C-alpha cells in the first residue's frame, strides 16, 4: 500500500505498524467477543490524534459506521475474494474442520454434513502447521487473498482448493483493502480509489 501511495500521490510514506486488540488476544473467540472493531480501534485512535494520516484496514473487519471525524476514502483494486479449503493431504473425507466463522461453517456443512467444528487460533502459519504436522484438525478454510499476501501457494502435507463463489459466498468486503482518513482529507486520498472495487464493497456492506 505504501508503494501505491508513493507512486500515485508522489508522497514519501513512513510506516507505523500497530497491534490491535484482535491481534493481541489470540485466545479469544471472535464470535463471543464480537469481531467487528477489534482490529480497527487502535488505528482509528491514531488517526484522530494525528499520529497517522491514513489507516489501512481489511474491509471485512470494518464496522459499518465510522467514528465521528473519520471516513473511508478509497478501496484499491481488490484481490481474489474466494475462500480456500485447506486439507491435510492424507484426508479425503474430513471429520473435523477448523473455523470460527458461522458463515463458513454453515455453507461448508452442506458439502460435509458429517463434519464437526473447532477453532484454531494463531496466525496463518501456525494454523497450517497445526493441520499438517500436529493434526489438530483435518483442515480449515482461509481467505485466498490472505494466503496470496503472505506468498503461500503450497505447504508441505497440505492441499489447497479454491471454492467457487456459488458454493462459498465470501464475507462482505473480503479481499478488499479500505483506506480510512480524517474527514477533512477525504478528497486528498480519494485518488487511490478503484471505482469497481469501491462500488462492489459498498454494496456488500
Where are these regions (language model features)?
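Short beta-strand segments
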Residues: 57-58, 98-100, 141-143, 180
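Short, structured active-site "lid" loops
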Residues: 27-54
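A conserved helix-loop-strand patch within extracytoplasmic ligand-binding domains
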Residues: 59-62, 66-115, 166, 186
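Short Gly/Pro-enriched turn/cap motifs at secondary-structure boundaries
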Residues: 36-37, 76, 167-170
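Small-molecule-sensing regulatory modules
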Residues: 1-32, 105, 110-205
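Conserved beta-strand termini and adjacent loop/short-helix elements that scaffold enzyme active sites
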Residues: 16-18, 57, 75, 100, ...
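Short, Asp-centered acidic motifs that coordinate Mg2+ and/or phosphate
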Residues: 52-56, 138-139
Amino acid at each position: 500500500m505504501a508503494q501505491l501511495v508513493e507512486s500515485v500521490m508522489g508522497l514519501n510514506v513512513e510506516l507505523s505498524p500497530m497491534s490491535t486488540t484482535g491481534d493481541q488476544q489470540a485466545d479469544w473467540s471472535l464470535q463471543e467477543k464480537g469481531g467487528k472493531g477489534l482490529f480497527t480501534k487502535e488505528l482509528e485512535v491514531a488517526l484522530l490524534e494525528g499520529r497517522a494520516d491514513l489507516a489501512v484496514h481489511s474491509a471485512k473487519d470494518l464496522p459499518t459506521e465510522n467514528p465521528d471525524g473519520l471516513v473511508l476514502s478509497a478501496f484499491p483494486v481488490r484481490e481474489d475474494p474466494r475462500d480456500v479449503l485447506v486439507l491435510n493431504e492424507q484426508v479425503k473425507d474430513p471429520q473435523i474442520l477448523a473455523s470460527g466463522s458461522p458463515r463458513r461453517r454453515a455453507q461448508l456443512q452442506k458439502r460435509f454434513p458429517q463434519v464437526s467444528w473447532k477453532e484454531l487460533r494463531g496466525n496463518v502459519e501456525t494454523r497450517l502447521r497445526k493441520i499438517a504436522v500436529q493434526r489438530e484438525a483435518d483442515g480449515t478454510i482461509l481467505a485466498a487473498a490472505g494466503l496470496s499476501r503472505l506468498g503461500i501457494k503450497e505447504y508441505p502435507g497440505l492441499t489447497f482448493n479454491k471454492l467457487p463463489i456459488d458454493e462459498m459466498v465470501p464475507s462482505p468486503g473480503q479481499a478488499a483493502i479500505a483506506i480510512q482518513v480524517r474527514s477533512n482529507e477525504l478528497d486528498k486520498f480519494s485518488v487511490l480509489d478503484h471505482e469497481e472495487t469501491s462500488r462492489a464493497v459498498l454494496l456488500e456492506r
